[in-house]
Amino acid sequence: MVNFVSVGLFRCLPVPCPEDLLVEELVDGLLSLEEELKDKEEEETVLDGLLSLEEESRGRLRRGPPGGKAPPRGETHRDRQRRAEEKRKRKKEREKEEEKQIAEYLKRKEEEKARRRKRAEEKAADFARRKQEEQERRERKWRQGAEKAKQHSARKEKMQELGVDGYTRQLEGEVESLEAERRRLLQEKEDLMGEVNYWQGRLEAMWLQ
């Protein structure tokens, strides 16, 4: 929907409708809510993974340290060392996996922030561009209106000066001059077309030879 407002010499200038601006703001709000929901889902996924790892670690702690129960029959000191080393290795791998997940999550968050900043900058630039275009359009309309008013005033003064008959004869003379200029331009166009056809014919003849 477009409203119209009177400005200066204008009678009807279209301006943005408040309903259109409200719809645009609602759409932006819905997009922001959708992005926040996606972020929360990612956070919940990472937290669920961390809680699972934490519960697994607590379960191992409740079962007691490796030396808390008698080693299997026939197990040597070297076997116990190997099992302890494997356990440390698995723990280190889990910690690395946790760090990797956290780093990936933080990276996604930073990328999302960068995308939001970029969209906000693009939106601000687009708004500024549209505002500038609207201002230029209004100024152009104002200049056109001022020029028309000036021409109308000049014609009115000329008509008052020459009278209706004199002004009519002047207009007829201007029309005859414009018609003569139009005939001259048409003749120049015909001459140019004839010259083009002449050279085109010569080129075609050369190619055929």
UniProtKB/Swiss-Prot annotation:
Q: What is its main location?
A: host cell
Top-level division of the source organism's lineage: Viruses
Question: What GO terms fall under cellular component here?
Answer: host cell nucleus
Q: Which UniProt keywords apply?
A: DNA-binding, Host nucleus, Host-virus interaction, Inhibition of host innate immune response by virus, Ubl conjugation, Viral immunoevasion
* InterPro entries found in the cross-reference section: HTLV1ZIPPER (IPR026220)
Q: Where is this motif: Nuclear localization signal 1?
A: 87-92
| Motif range (Nuclear localization signal 3) | 137-141
The protein's location, in the record's own words, is: Host nucleus
Region annotation (Disordered) ranges:
41-165
List the ranges annotated as motif Nuclear localization signal 2. 116-120
As for PTM, the annotation reads: Ubiquitinated by host E3 ligase UBR5 leading to HBZ degradation.
Quote the subunit structure annotation.
Interacts with host ATF4; this interaction inhibits viral RNA transcriptional activation by preventing ATF4 binding to Tax-responsive elements. Interacts with host CREB1; this interaction inhibits host CREB1 transcriptional activity. Interacts with host JUN, JUNB and JUND. Interacts with host EP300 and CREBBP; these interactions inhibit the association of the coactivators with the viral promoter. Interacts with host UBR5; this interaction regulates HBZ protein stability. Interacts with XRCC5 and XRCC6. Interacts with IRF7 and IKBKE; this interaction modulates host interferon signaling.
Domain note: Contains three nuclear localization signals NLS-1 and NLS-2, corresponding to two regions rich in basic amino acids, and NLS-3 corresponding to its DNA-binding domain.
Purpose: Enhances viral infectivity and persistence, and facilitates proliferation of HTLV-1-infected lymphocytes. Mechanistically, inhibits Tax-mediated viral replication and NF-kappa-B activation. Plays a role in allowing infected T-cells to escape the cytotoxic T-lymphocyte response by maintaining low levels of viral protein production. Also inhibits host EP300 histone acetyltransferase (HAT) activity, reducing levels of acetylated histone H3 at 'Lys-18' (H3K18ac) in infected cells.
What does the miscellaneous comment read?
Answer: Expressed from antisense transcripts. While mRNA expression levels of HBZ-SI were similar to those of HBZ, HBZ-SI seems slightly more expressed at the protein level ex vivo.
Recorded family membership: Belongs to the HTLV-1 HBZ protein family.
User: Which protein is depicted?
Assistant: HTLV-1 basic zipper factor
Source organism per UniProt: Human T-cell leukemia virus 1 (isolate Caribbea HS-35 subtype A) (HTLV-1)
